[in-house]
UniProtKB/Swiss-Prot annotation:
Protein role: Transcription repressor that specifically binds to the 5'-TATTTT[T/G]-3' consensus sequence on promoters and repress transcription of PGC-1-alpha (PPARGC1A), thereby playing a role in regulation of neuron death.
Sites of the Glycyl lysine isopeptide (Lys-Gly) (interchain with G-Cter in SUMO2) crosslink: 283, 287
Gene field: Znf746
Lineage: Eukaryota, Metazoa, Chordata, Craniata, Vertebrata
Organism of derivation: Mus musculus (Mouse)
Stated name of the protein: Zinc finger protein 746
Pro residues: bias regions: 607-618
Amino acid sequence: MAEAAAAPISPWTMAATIQAMERKIESQAARLLSLEGRTGMAEKKLADCEKTAVEFSNQLEGKWAVLGTLLQEYGLLQRRLENVENLLRNRNFWILRLPPGSKGEVPKEWGKLEDWQKELYKHVMRGNYETLVSLDYAISKPEVLSQIEQGKEPCTWRRTGPKVPEVPVDPSPGSGAPVPAPDLLMQIKQEGELQLQEQQALGVEAWAAGQPDIGEEPWGLSQLDSGAGDISTDATSGVHSNFSTTIPPTSWQADLPPHHPSSACSDGTLKLNTAASTEADVKIVIKTEVQEEEVVATPVHPTDLEAHGTLFAPGQATRFFPSPVQEGAWESQGSSFPSQDPVLGLREPTRPERDIGELSPAIAQEEAPAGDWLFGGVRWGWNFRCKPPVGLNPRTVPEGLPFSSPDNGEAILDPSQAPRPFNDPCKYPGRTKGFGHKPGLKKHPAAPPGGRPFTCATCGKSFQLQVSLSAHQRSCGLSDGAATGAASTTTGGGGGGSGGGGGSSGGGSSARDSSALRCGECGRCFTRPAHLIRHRMLHTGERPFPCTECEKRFTERSKLIDHYRTHTGVRPFTCTVCGKSFIRKDHLRKHQRNHPAVAKAPAHGQPLPPLPAPPDPFKSPAAKGPMASTDLVTDWTCGLSVLGPSDGGGDL
């Protein structure tokens, strides 16, 4: 054992161990380097986050500062609003107009203005003589007027009404200043209207006409009307209509209106009696005007309108504006018209029937818009699905109107030839079945005397026509022979002989048709080859009509044509009432249901508007020009079906 322990270690083993230790140390060093890199990146991200947090805090401080400014401005605006409400409540403030100089210089009269007044004037002049009405610069004492004008102490302003405590101009939120209620503002407006009527009654406009122009004096003082709560603007002069007049200082004492009494002061200045306002002190508002000359708005009286021939004479207005009684008579008469004044050439129809023959309308109303006559049946009640009476032009005769004869002017009424209402279909005599047009009525045969003589032997259904029974037998898988035999046994001997003969000949043809027009997938039978071809596309998924503009494909040529119009912009179906165009005809019909069924008759003696020209299928309304040759080739190609060129029937 001791010999084994004392055996020396091989140098190769030592070298391998040392190499393994070195590799392990290198891996640990690489791992340490990666950890140091990740630590540096984390520190950098942390620094970026701290920087972003600082920026957010700065932005938040800025937002808080802006919010504080907004709150301060809101409080200031609220105080201004309370100030304006107090002024409107007191109804006793003045508007001072500062006329600017000719070249922007300060007039000599303004040498003794205060500093804030000069600063205000500079701001006004900087605005290129724009109109400024500032309710912010409200002064509590009116003596500034005389101080600015004459440069001396003004006289005391007196009132005849009782004194009340002064209302502060800029009340604080805790001052408890009264705020007018909405009903008080309405009362102010009503009082202003009453005073305006009193001014018109007393002839105030005559007094205002004798006033000199505002340009004669450097100062213009105008008192706002007592209805300050309802300030309106004259559209012609741009001046508030509540400004009653302009009073120069030299003519204040002599030319005041009757409802504003005046008396002389001790120093020759103006003293106004402000008995109409007893709530608070007088307020002053600084204002500059753009106009050098002000036109006083004079109310218009009905007498002036009559002098210029603007109003209707007694009885004239009723000829142009019918009374409600006449309007009610119009509604009660339905499509007929009421009696009118002979001046307009209108008369009342005596009976609801209409004239027949070559007639002219006897009622002349306004001209109907272009296009109302093509679909006139919807608007006049004509049934264009039925043939109109002989000699009657449906494009010229609206329903419910009388017509005069060209010979003697008498009405020719024939109830038997009256046009049928729009919703009344053509009916066969003695039958209840209705048809939309006269050709359909002619094609419908008379009812057989036996009712439904053709009965199916399989299911027992009865039919009036043998053609219907044959089609039904194909769906049941039988031939026409069985159907004919069943029909012969039902109709009798004579009918049986003819039915039997027809059955032998028709049985073979129906068998051939049944085998030729039967779907091999589901066994369904069809009466036309086109229907079978269209049905087979449902099983095969074939869409033989591709669009050259996009990737869509269609099973029918008509659907491809409708889709292709979305690319070309062609809308061939145009509404004759409003002019809107549509791609499909059913869209046009749906749109025409929204139009009212009332139209206007053409004027008497005027020709009818021409029919609208048919739309050009080779011209796009969006492009306003002819279509390209490639589009024409595409349209011709799209018109080819699997059976060849389409015959216009639209089956495929």
